[in-house]
From Swiss-Prot:
<dbReference type="InterPro" id="IPR019614">
    <property type="entry name" value="SAM-dep_methyl-trfase"/>
</dbReference>
<dbReference type="GO" id="GO:0005737">
    <property type="term" value="C:cytoplasm"/>
</dbReference>
<keyword id="KW-0949">S-adenosyl-L-methionine</keyword>
<protein>
    <recommendedName>
        <fullName>Ribosomal RNA large subunit methyltransferase K/L</fullName>
        <ecNumber>2.1.1.173</ecNumber>
        <ecNumber>2.1.1.264</ecNumber>
    </recommendedName>
</protein>
<keyword id="KW-0489">Methyltransferase</keyword>
<dbReference type="InterPro" id="IPR017244">
    <property type="entry name" value="23SrRNA_methyltr_KL"/>
</dbReference>
<dbReference type="Pfam" id="PF01170">
    <property type="entry name" value="UPF0020"/>
</dbReference>
<keyword id="KW-0694">RNA-binding</keyword>
<dbReference type="InterPro" id="IPR002052">
    <property type="entry name" value="DNA_methylase_N6_adenine_CS"/>
</dbReference>
<dbReference type="GO" id="GO:0003723">
    <property type="term" value="F:RNA binding"/>
</dbReference>
<keyword id="KW-0808">Transferase</keyword>
<dbReference type="InterPro" id="IPR004114">
    <property type="entry name" value="THUMP_dom"/>
</dbReference>
<dbReference type="Pfam" id="PF02926">
    <property type="entry name" value="THUMP"/>
</dbReference>
<dbReference type="InterPro" id="IPR029063">
    <property type="entry name" value="SAM-dependent_MTases_sf"/>
</dbReference>
<comment type="function">
    <text>Specifically methylates the guanine in position 2445 (m2G2445) and the guanine in position 2069 (m7G2069) of 23S rRNA.</text>
</comment>
<dbReference type="GO" id="GO:0070043">
    <property type="term" value="F:rRNA (guanine-N7-)-methyltransferase activity"/>
</dbReference>
<dbReference type="InterPro" id="IPR053943">
    <property type="entry name" value="RlmKL-like_Mtase_CS"/>
</dbReference>
Amino acid sequence: MKKYLAITSKGLENLLADELIALGVTDPKVVHAGVKFEAPIEVVYRCCLWSRIASRFIQILSEFDVRDDMDLYLGASSINWPSYFSADKTLVVDFNGTNREIRNSQYGALKVKDAIVDRFTKADLARPNISKVEPDLRVHMRLSGEKGILGFDLVGSGLHQRGYRTEAGRAPLRETLAAALVMRSTWDESKPLLDPMCGSGTLLIEAALMACEMAPGVKREKWCFEALNDFDAELWAEIRSEARVKSRRGVKKVDARFYGFDRDYRVIQTARENARRAGVEDLITFDVGDATKVECPEGFENGVILCNPPYGERLSTEPALIALYSEFGRQLKEVFGGCTASIYSSNDDLLACLRMRADKQFKLNNGALPCVQKNYSITESAERKEAVSIEVAPEFMNRLKKNIGKIGKWARKEKLDCYRIYDADLPDYNAAIDVYKDYIIIQEYAAPKTISEDKARRRLTDMIRATVLVTGVETNNVILKVRQKQSGKNQYQKLAEKSRYFDVEEYGVKLIVNLQDYLDTGLFLDHKLTRKMLGEIAAGKDFLNLFAYTGSATVHAACGGAKSTMTIDMSRTYLEWAQKNMNTNGQTGTQHQFLQADCLQWLQQADGEFDLIFIDPPTFSNSKRMEQTFDVQRDHIMLLENLKRMLRENGTIVFSNNKRNFKMDEAGLEKAGLKAKNISKQTLPLDFARNKHIHNCWIITHKED
């Protein structure tokens, strides 16, 4: 008997071996990402037609050592290729793997092709043509270290191409992988199956095909083994005919029901089309639905929930997934008690959010991505246990509830859309949580090096889950950012090109924020009282805003009746943002000026006069566009001396900065002819009361003679 290699995904080797035994193979041998076996051609044909989890079947022609390209050529040349196929057949060489000498798969494929063609030429036969588009034959060369396997791919295009799927939803599963997940899910034909995040319906369709005893390759038109000299057309026709009859009978006798839900109506339409092409549309009910709200269908008491939720490769960029898994887990326990669930994901942290203990788990790659499938029993006892311990991170939840009760009431009274509800109150949960209208930003501070990465991630996961539970915020409206000590060029780091702008209200003023594109949002929440104060004292005054950022202080001053405003920042992006802020509040006209400039340089040569000046410089800056470094502790007197030249006799400078333990140089200030009053306490809002050093703020005026 001839030798064969069945190829599959890593982690499915034993499952494939069992499947091949059921199809008539004896003594299969498991190898890495495959199974080797010997079998008569009838069994091989059945395996190609009926295997649900093999991706390819290779007829092994030779196994040989490959140290270099000469070994490769000689090994391929040793095969009597004309005895296997005729020269009128087109072919392509698929080369997989490299070693120290053969580092390029295209080069390896070329050497094998040369050996095949040369063998025909030496036999005085025509050269077979090479075709990369639908060739009659595919020659398969697999190289692992110095060991090579050379043979024919009996299938052609991968066996996952069943013929029923032409398009898919997000990140579709290969059909072979989907079939494996069904096999390991605890589902059998006696049970109903539900996929609450079904996408294009692949999991349900594969299960329905199993229930119908429909061969996965029955709709496939082309097989590469048909181009081989020893192809038995009569035997193959008999095996295919038998499979078609079995499929038709199977559809009629199936009692199992299948249910698929997805939030995207267009994806549901695609799933219905896929089921129709697969011939199982009458068995599957597809509907638009939210996995976190899905109800148990009638007669589903012993059913199986199987799904492949979105899992994202980076937890830090997908906080909504934490909330999704948390709510989904709660829904499973509340609605599907007595059923079983099988969830496939690459992220153990997300699976932990389900708050369920797996009975069994299987490691199984999705392509190159390591993933795991976990099976859960959703028992009544588990449901009661969850009811007792429904709170996640109870200490954190209790603090958050308390803060929201106090700060939320104050914010509503003050007419504030944006405020902080948590500011690293508890040492184990080191983050700031801000409300921006209907959105919540969780700003995680970098964990100390003494805390393990796994523990830090688990605490972050718990924080996000608890925040969603306490606030009731929509999961897609949770945004996660990691905050670290900022310096120089990453002070206002751009994050992504999502461009999500919207208006918020602050003491009757409308301001534009952007929660996605930058590390900061366009609004420093700790300065809300400072901005309010500026608006209250700006009437009839010429106002200057330096290091203006998005100009929110200018907007308050203008809305408070300022005679004129000058807004200066080095960033064109922020100046344009400031102009939009002003326009949103109807503050237009030539009395409102905007200037892109290095504020430090501008101060050295400016000669205007102002009644009210607001300056909130960075603690430290070494921007490439600034000609010098700036340190607010070292340079604040120089800064204020320059401002004094432009300050009218009864004018006021509101000077603020965020340097912890900042000390005003009172002697230097007096020498400069200025005096200062510390108003930090008056400008510290309730939502920042715990962080008394978030900023310091001063009223600077001319010293009286």
